[in-house]
C-alpha cells in the first residue's frame, strides 16, 4: 500500500464472515449494483441513512452516509475500488468516524445455482492509541453488522430468485413498511413507482386523496399496486375528529385509487390494499385465521370499511388482496421503537395484566408477504401478516427482556394507559387478537422469522 495509507502504518483490526447464498455469484453481485442495496444492508438498530451516491460500484464511485455518533451526526464518505464486475468490490473510507476503514466484498460460485459471499473488514479505531481500547467493542459491532447483512442478503436473494421483474406502484412509500419495501423491491430487479403528494419527480406519480386528485396516466401498464398509505393510528388521542381523519385517510384514499385503477385501459393485475388485524376486535384466546368473522369496535369497523373501499378494483376484474398487518417489529418505528427505551433501562414489562395476545411480525416478513402477494396469482382476499406463533403480551415482554438481557417485570397499569390514551389503550394495547397466517402458509410463503424471538434478534442484532 502507499506510505500515505493509514493501513500501512498501523496494524488494522480484521473482521471476516463467509455465507452460502442460493444463487450464482453474478446474481448476488447484481443485487448489490441495484438501487436500494445499501438501504437494505444498513442495520435497523443503527441511526444511519444514505445521503448521496454516484456511479454504482465502479472504481471511483462514492457513497455518503449520515451516521450518529452519540449526540453528533457525522458524514461517512466511502469510495469504491478494486471492482471486478460479477466478482468483487471494495469500500474505502475517505472521511468518517474511523482512522481507516476498508471493506472487501467477494462473490464466488459454489455450484450451478449457489455461491458464497466473503466479507473482510479492516479498520483502525479513531483517537490513536487511546482508541485501541475500544477495539473489542468495535469488532463485536462490525461482526453484528456483517451477520445482519449476510442474513438479509441470503433471504432477499431467495425471495427474488426466479421472479420476473415487475413495475410496482407503492403508496405510503415513506412510512415504516413502505420505506423498507421499496429498496427490497428495487434490489430484486423490480421498477418501483412511488405515489407522492408533492410535485412528482422521475419515477413518481402525483396523488392527493384529501383532494380526490390522482394522475392516472402514470399508472397505465403498471403490473401491481401496493397501497399502504393511511394516517398513523398511534399519532394522537382518538378524539371524534381524529377518528374521522383515520377513517377518511384509509377509505377515501383506497376508493380513489380503486376507482382510478378500474378506469385504466391497461389496469394492473393486482391491487394489494392494506388492512390490519384490528378488524378481528378483542377476541380473547380464540385462534383467528382468515375465515374468522370480523369483530366489534372502532378498529373492526374501520377495517371493514377500509377493505370494502377497494371494491371498484375488484369489480373491474383486478385481483385484490388485503394484508391484515399485525404488530410490525422494527426499531425504526412502531410499537417496538417505543418500547426499547424503557426495556433497555430495565423499566419494561407487561402491559395491563399481560394476558392479551399480541400477533407480531418482523419488518422483513411484512415486506416479504407483500411481495409474495404481488407475485402469487392464487392469493386474493384477506390474508393475515403475522408470525405463525402468536404470544401473550406478558410473553412478549419476557422475550424482549431476554433478547436485551434486561429484566422485564415492571408492568404498565391498564388504568394509566386509559388515562393517557383513552379508547386507543383498550383497542390497540389491551385488546387480545390471537391471529395466525393461514393463507400465507397455504400459498407457500416461507417465514424468515417464525417466532417473535427470532424477529427481535434479527432487527436488534442480538
Question: What does each of the following model-derived ranges do?
Answer:
Residues 243, 255-297:
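Conserved Rossmann-fold NAD(P)-dependent oxidoreductase catalytic core, especially the SDR/UDP-sugar
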Residues 1-58:
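Hydrophobic ligand-binding cavity/cleft-lining segments
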Residues 166, 376-423, 457:
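Mid/C-terminal beta-alpha module of Rossmann-like enzyme folds, strongest
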Residues 275, 308-331:
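Conserved beta-loop-beta element that borders a ligand/cofactor-binding pocket
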Residues 338-361, 365:
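A conserved pocket-lining segment of Rossmann-fold NAD(P)-dependent short-chain dehydrogenase/reductase
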Residues 5, 81-82, 90-143, 227:
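Beta-strand/loop substructures that line and gate deep hydrophobic ligand-binding cavities in soluble
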Residues 206-253:
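NAD(P)H-binding glycine-rich loop region in Rossmannoid oxidoreductase-like domains
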Residues 316-318, 329-338, 373-383:
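Glycine/proline-rich active-site loop of Rossmann-fold NAD(P)-dependent oxidoreductases
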Amino acid at each position: 500500500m502507499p506510505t500515505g495509507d493509514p493501513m500501512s502504518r498501523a496494524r488494522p483490526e480484521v473482521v471476516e464472515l463467509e455465507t452460502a447464498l442460493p444463487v450464482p455469484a453474478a446474481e448476488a453481485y447484481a443485487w448489490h449494483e441495484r438501487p436500494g442495496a445499501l438501504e437494505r444492508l444498513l442495520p435497523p438498530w443503527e441511526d444511519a441513512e444514505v445521503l448521496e451516491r454516484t456511479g454504482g460500484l465502479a472504481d471511483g464511485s462514492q457513497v455518503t452516509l449520515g451516521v450518529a455518533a452519540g449526540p453528533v451526526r457525522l458524514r461517512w464518505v466511502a469510495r469504491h475500488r478494486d471492482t471486478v464486475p460479477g466478482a468483487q468490490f471494495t469500500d474505502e473510507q475517505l472521511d468518517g468516524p474511523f482512522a481507516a476503514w476498508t471493506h472487501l466484498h467477494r462473490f464466488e460460485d459454489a455450484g450451478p445455482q449457489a455461491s458464497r459471499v466473503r466479507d473482510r473488514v479492516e479498520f483502525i479505531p479513531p483517537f490513536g492509541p487511546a482508541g485501541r481500547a475500544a477495539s473489542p467493542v468495535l469488532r463485536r459491532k462490525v461482526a453484528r453488522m456483517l451477520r445482519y447483512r449476510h442474513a438479509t442478503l441470503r433471504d432477499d436473494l431467495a425471495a427474488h430468485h426466479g421472479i420476473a421483474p415487475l413495475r410496482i406502484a407503492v403508496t405510503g412509500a415513506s412510512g415504516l413498511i413502505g420505506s423498507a419495501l421499496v429498496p427490497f423491491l428495487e434490489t430484486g430487479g423490480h421498477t418501483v413507482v412511488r405515489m407522492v403528494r408533492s410535485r412528482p419527480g422521475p419515477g413518481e406519480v402525483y396523488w392527493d386523496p384529501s383532494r380526490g386528485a390522482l394522475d392516472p396516466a402514470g399508472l397505465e401498464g403498471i403490473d401491481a399496486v401496493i397501497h399502504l398509505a393511511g394516517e398513523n393510528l398511534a399519532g394522537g388521542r382518538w378524539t371524534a375528529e381524529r377518528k374521522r381523519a383515520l377513517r377518511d385517510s384509509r377509505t377515501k384514499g383506497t376508493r380513489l385509487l380503486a376507482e382510478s385503477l378500474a378506469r385504466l385501459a391497461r389496469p394492473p393485475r393486482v391491487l394489494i390494499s392494506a388492512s390490519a388485524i384490528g378488524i378481528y376486535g378483542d377476541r380473547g384466546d380464540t385462534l383467528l385465521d382468515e375465515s374468522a368473522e370480523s369483530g366489534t369496535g372502532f378498529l373492526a369497523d374501520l377495517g371493514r370499511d377500509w377493505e370494502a373501499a377497494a371494491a371498484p378494483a375488484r369489480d373491474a376484474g383486478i385481483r385484490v388482496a388485503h394484508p391484515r398487518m399485525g404488530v410490525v417489529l422494527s426499531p425504526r418505528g412502531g410499537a417496538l421503537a417505543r418500547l426499547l427505551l424503557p426495556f433497555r433501562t430495565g423499566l419494561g414489562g407487561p402491559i395491563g395484566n399481560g394476558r392479551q395476545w399480541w400477533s407480531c411480525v418482523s419488518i422483513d416478513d411484512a415486506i416479504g408477504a407483500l411481495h409474495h402477494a404481488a407475485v402469487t396469482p392464487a392469493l386474493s382476499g384477506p390474508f393475515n401478516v403475522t408470525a405463525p406463533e402468536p404470544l401473550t403480551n406478558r410473553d412478549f415482554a419476557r422475550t424482549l427482556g431476554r433478547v436485551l438481557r434486561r429484566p422485564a417485570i415492571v408492568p404498565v397499569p391498564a388504568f394509566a394507559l386509559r388515562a393517557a390514551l383513552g379508547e386507543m389503550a383498550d383497542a390497540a394495547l389491551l385488546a387480545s387478537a390471537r391471529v395466525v397466517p393461514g393463507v400465507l402458509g397455504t400459498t407457500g410463503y416461507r417465514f424468515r422469522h417464525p417466532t417473535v424471538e427470532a424477529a427481535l434478534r434479527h432487527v436488534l442484532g442480538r
